[in-house]
């Protein structure tokens, strides 16, 4: 009975790195998409464009830095809002880069917004792109408040990442080695008992 507990615990420990790696990608794909949602405030008073974006940052992240660029051409406003986040209980290095960019077109009564959001997870080398096209909102007293929602979501794993390949190889080698050790140990115990 004691031997069976040892076998189960060793196999569990050998499988954990593989499960942790795949679950982190799944967790990123399902939960971190909420980082792209929030409210976008557009205000145009006295020919000055003011854009304010309040992103939704979950409790599990700490905010590091933010950038905002705004360009205007006729009735079009182009903006890019980027921010860097890290996991609260992770390393000091940023683990997520979120970049929200878009085109806002306005007239006297309404504004139309095209928005795309890129989430780059540096820990798992995965990226998610969310896009939204031609959402129209009413313009009230030169202010347009948009609630950002998306039409399509594309998720992909970065191809040129050499560290994940090394990690995958190491995890598989650990799994094979621990399985061989347990198998040899079990055969020796069976041989000694017979």
From Swiss-Prot:
Residues 187-194 are cytoplasmic. Residues 1-22 form the signal peptide. Residues 23-165 are extracellular. InterPro entries: Orthopox_A43R (IPR009487). Disulfide bonds: none annotated. It is a single-pass type I membrane protein. This is Protein A43. It comes from Vaccinia virus (strain Copenhagen).
């Amino acid at each position: 009975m004691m031997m069976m507990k040892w076998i189960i615990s060793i196999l569990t420990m050998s499988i954990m790195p593989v499960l942790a790696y795949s679950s982190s990608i799944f967790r990123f794909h399902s939960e971190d998409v909420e980082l792209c949602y929030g409210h976008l405030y557009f205000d145009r008073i006295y020919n000055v464009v003011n854009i304010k974006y309040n992103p939704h940052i979950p409790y599990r992240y700490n905010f590091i830095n933010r950038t905002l660029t705004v360009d205007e051409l006729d009735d079009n406003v182009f903006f890019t809002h980027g921010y860097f986040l890290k996991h609260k209980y992770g390393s000091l290095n940023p683990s997520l880069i979120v970049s929200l960019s878009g085109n806002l077109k306005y007239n006297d009564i309404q504004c139309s917004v095209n928005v795309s959001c890129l989430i780059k997870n540096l820990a798992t080398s995965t990226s998610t792109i969310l896009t939204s096209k031609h959402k129209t909102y009413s313009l009230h007293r030169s202010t347009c408040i948009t609630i950002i929602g998306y039409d399509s979501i594309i998720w992909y794993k970065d191809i040129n990442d050499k560290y994940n390949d090394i990690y995958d190889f190491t995890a598989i080698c650990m799994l094979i080695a621990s399985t061989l050790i347990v198998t040899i140990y079990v055969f020796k115990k069976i041989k000694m008992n017979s």
